[in-house]
């Protein structure tokens, strides 16, 4: 199978799906219509599925062999952002936007599902298509895993994202509340961070004769790819786009709850480039003007398919 050519046959479908999901975004754990639309597409393809944790969906495509079982995952939720683009398919849900590309992720996986369904006779494995809710809440993956159905870096990012204090401009505030996030790749360093942060808070408050309360909640672990799966993925990209289509880098401090899957199963998390300044697709994720180059939908769907075909021969 020439994967890229097979996926290109469905480019119009991929674009239409992406625009439909972009037009109707839903927040984490509220993806009712999104899930229903995904399930209708799976019904039309004749792919059976299970409804998981309400708005999650796990579809199963059986090949000639039961094993290995290989999962392809996408996230489906949107963000609480008021869209500021003038796109004809801009959000119709005021104050909610697919500003992180999840509309594209859904489209890519559904397109990959179509191609894989067309070529079931070439599958020597069982495929799990995982449509995960609530990635932005960072607990959707863990909730799905809890149902039972499914290198050394020292980077640390500490972000203070909110600061609330006071009620009026002419009244001194008695209290202030700050909140934020912490991200690191190093599990041992992650354990040390609460003490490191509290020491800074304590010394700062002592300098100003203030009291403090410190609450620290552990959230998602670092997303660390399996080396073997990464090698398979790299070869898959080269088959589709050539050597120039592959970009490798050490890591990024962005948060991603796919890490819960990687804690339990060997796997790989990859980015699909979608920036194209000539088309106005130049804003970063979570920006009110974010948009993606829809040509990337073909590359993403093709990667899903090619990786599946390559991985089934390696496990």
Q: How would you name each of these model-derived features?
A:
Residues 6, 10, 16-20, 37, ...:
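Generic non-transmembrane alpha-helical segments
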Residues 136, 142-228, 252-253, 259:
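Midchain, well-structured core segments that form catalytic/ion-binding scaffolds
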